A protein has these predicted regions:
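Short glycine-/acidic-enriched loop or helix-start segments at secondary-structure transitions
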Residues: 15-16, 37, 61-64, 85, ...
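Mid-chain, well-packed structural core segment of small domains
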Residues: 59-93
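Charged phosphate-binding loop/patch that engages nucleotide di/tri-phosphates or the phosphate backbone
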Residues: 97-119
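N-terminal first-folded block
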Residues: 2-49
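Acidic, metal-binding active-site segment of PIN/NYN-like and related structure-specific nucleases
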Residues: 44-62
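Short, glycine/charged-enriched secondary-structure capping and boundary segments
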Residues: 18-21, 40-41, 65-68, 89, ...
């Protein structure tokens, strides 16, 4: 079962909903609020967690800067950004039988792109 690290920009209701759905998820805001993106990646790597974020910078860090982007990254792109909608979208996404490890995934409503992380 995959483990996830939710970036600070993921709404608290989405993190709480994922926890209620028995998803192993840690929220950056709970453990290290305010840390920079490099530290977020290091934390995800150290704990073996897939990063869940709205921040496109993590794609740039992985593909253009060659930084290790954790065990994997899921870039959330739901149609609506209301916290309740994001919560439902996130829980439905994380409960899919997908191997997130080693991939950069872009999740949109009705579309999921999964690209292997650069070596």
């Amino acid at each position: 079962m995959a483990k996830f690290l939710a970036h600070e920009n993921v709404p608290s209701v989405a993190v709480e909903a994922a926890r209620r759905a028995c998803v192993d998820i840690v929220w950056v805001r709970d453990i290290s609020p305010g840390i920079g993106d490099d530290a977020v990646l290091a934390l995800a790597q150290a704990e073996g967690r897939i990063l869940l974020t709205f921040d496109k910078d993590f794609g740039e860090m992985a593909f253009e800067q060659g930084k290790t982007a954790a065990p994997g990254v899921i870039l959330l792109r739901p149609r609506l950004r209301s916290p309740d909608h994001v919560a439902k979208f996130t829980v439905a996404l994380l409960n899919q039988p997908i191997d997130w490890a080693g991939n950069f995934s872009v999740a949109q409503e009705g579309r999921l792109r999964v690209v292997p992380m650069p070596a």
